């Protein structure tokens, strides 16, 4: 079995079926995906990097005429390019959870008061009797692990907020659970600690079958970076509560023109989005 080197330095077996599954998720037909997997299988060699394999797959999707699937295949890279200075990842997660039935708020003001100190919360999500405090941990390098310290701090934050609420502290909230959301993955110790302390983790392919990537794909709520928008363009959109491609698709053309998008370009972008969210569309 050919060994490949993952971006975090770990060694793994080459898995042809993973290629098929990932291509299918991107929207290509199973027949095309099988051909691409065969092609890659013929090109891999001992010690090849997973990054080189991803580049091969992306290129083969393009040359096979599946340009929209090729765009979707770059989802992980697009998420990593969200800009921390304009809090894109936090806003993106805030909007994503709304599709899941939550009422969400980013960085509530005034800060949430605990028993001991006040706390800046990335996202507060409410659904029925559930009130969740969420820490959004974004990494530019998509092989960077989120370590033990993050869920430990989040559990301590929840403990203090719960204490503040029980004491009737002003600006407290009735927090019922704590989450950490990251665009990469977690260290083994972070996972073990979170299971023990009931801190919910969401990451790329974690929990298995219900990870952040599956959630994005289920709702077709792709980031604005996936359609090639520049940082200054995305900043204008974020300031107008447009956080993902679905928001942009629904945006009024007059608003888009006012913030610098000519009608013709706005329509081209919306046409691209329509194809991305509906792979079967011609």
Where do the protein language model's features map onto the residues?
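Long, C-terminal-biased catalytic regions of enzyme "large/alpha" subunits
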Residues: 1-82, 89
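Short leucine-rich amphipathic alpha-helices used at interfaces
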Residues: 3-5, 9-12, 203-205, 211-213, ...
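Residues marking the start of alpha-helices
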Residues: 10, 24, 182, 225-226, ...
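Short Gly/charged-rich anion-binding patches and loops
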Residues: 18, 92, 189, 232, ...
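Intrinsically disordered, low-complexity Ser/Thr/Pro/Gly-rich regulatory segments
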Residues: 31, 57, 61-221, 238-241
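RNA-recognition motif
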Residues: 34, 108, 251
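Compact, charge-rich alpha-helical regulatory domains located at protein termini
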Residues: 209, 214-282
């Amino acid at each position: 079995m050919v060994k490949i080197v993952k971006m975090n330095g770990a060694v793994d077996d080459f898995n042809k079926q993973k290629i098929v599954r990932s291509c299918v998720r991107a929207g290509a037909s199973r027949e095309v995906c099988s051909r691409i997997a065969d092609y890659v299988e013929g090109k891999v060699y001992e010690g090849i990097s997973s990054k080189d394999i991803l580049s091969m797959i992306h290129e083969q999707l393009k040359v096979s005429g599946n340009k929209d699937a090729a765009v979707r295949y770059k989802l992980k890279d697009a998420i990593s390019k969200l800009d921390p200075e304009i809090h894109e990842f936090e806003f993106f997660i805030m909007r994503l959870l709304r599709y899941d039935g939550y009422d969400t708020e980013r960085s509530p003001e005034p800060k949430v008061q605990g028993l001991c100190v006040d706390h800046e919360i990335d996202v507060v999500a409410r659904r029925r009797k559930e009130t969740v405090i969420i820490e959004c941990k974004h990494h530019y390098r998509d092989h960077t692990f989120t370590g033990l310290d993050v869920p430990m701090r989040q559990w301590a934050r929840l403990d203090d907020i719960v204490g503040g609420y029980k004491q009737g502290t002003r600006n407290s909230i009735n927090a019922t659970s704590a989450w950490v959301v990251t665009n990469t993955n977690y260290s083994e110790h972070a996972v073990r600690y979170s299971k023990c302390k009931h801190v919910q983790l969401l990451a790329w392919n974690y929990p298995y079958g219900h990870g952040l990537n599956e959630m994005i794909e289920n709702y077709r709520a792709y980031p604005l970076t996936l359609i090639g928008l520049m940082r200054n363009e995305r900043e204008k959109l974020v300031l107008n509560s447009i956080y993902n491609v679905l928001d942009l698709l629904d945006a009024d053309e007059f608003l888009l023109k006012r913030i610098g998008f000519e009608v013709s370009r706005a329509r081209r972008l919306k046409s691209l989005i329509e194809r991305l969210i509906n792979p079967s569309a011609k």
